[in-house]
Amino acid sequence: MNVKFKMPKLSNLLKKSWASELLMTFLGTTISIVLTFGTATWVEHRQQMKNRRQTAMMVISNINVFGENMRYIDSTLVKWSSTLRYIAELPRDSVLNLSTDDANAFLSAMFGAMLLQRDKTAENIFTSDISTWRDVGNLRFISGVGECYSFINDIEKNYRIQLERKGELRQRFFEDYYNEQMTGGECVAALLDMKGTKYFINDFTGSFVYYFEESINNLLQMNRINMQLIGVTPEEVMNFIKAGEQPLQ
C-alpha cells in the first residue's frame, strides 16, 4: 500500500511559526505586566495602610500624652485647692497666727503656676492637611480626633484664664504690700482681705478643679474610642510613646 505524505508548504510553516512566537511573546508580556502591576499595587496598598496607622498612632499618642500631663498637674491642683479652702475658712485670728510653713503653703497655692504645655505638631498636621486624613479612610476616627483637639483647646483656654486671674491677684498684692514688713500670717490675711481673692478661691476650689479632673477622664475616654475605631490597644500607644521618647542613636 502506497502511503502518500502531503508536505506542508513552506509559507504555511513560516506563518504558523511566526504566529506561535507572536502569541507566546504577547502572553509573556501580558503575564509580566499583570504580575508587576499587581505586585506594585499590593506594595503600595501595604505602604498606605502602614502610613495610615502611623499617622493615626501619632495623633492618638499626642492626645494621650496631653491627658497624662493634665493628670500630673491635677495632683498639684488638688493639693493647692485643699490648702486654699482650709485656710480661707479659718477665723481671722487663726490666719494671723499661721505658722511659717502654713503661710508659705497658702501663698504657693495662690501664686504658684504650672504650665500646661503640649507639642502641637500632630494637631497642626491634622488641621492643615485634611487630605492626609482622608487617606486614613475612617470618618468616625477623623471626627473623633477633631473633637478631642477642640476639647483640648477649650481646656487650655479655661486653664489659661485661671493663670491670668492668679497673675492679676499676685501683681496687685505685690504692688500694695511689696515694701511692707509682715509676718507670714499677716501676708495671708492681707491677701484674703484683698478684693477678688475669696471669689477666686471659691471658684478655683469649688468648680475649676472638678472641671479639670472631669476633663481628664472625658478626654482619655474619647481617645480610647479613637483607639477602638482603628484597632489600636492602649499598650501599643504606650509603646509608641516610649519609642518616641528614646534619644536618637
For the regions a language model picked out, list residue spans one by one.
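Alpha-helical transmembrane signal-anchor/signal-peptide segments
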Residues: 43-61
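Interfacial alpha-helical end/capping and short helix-turn segments at domain and membrane boundaries
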Residues: 2-14, 60-249
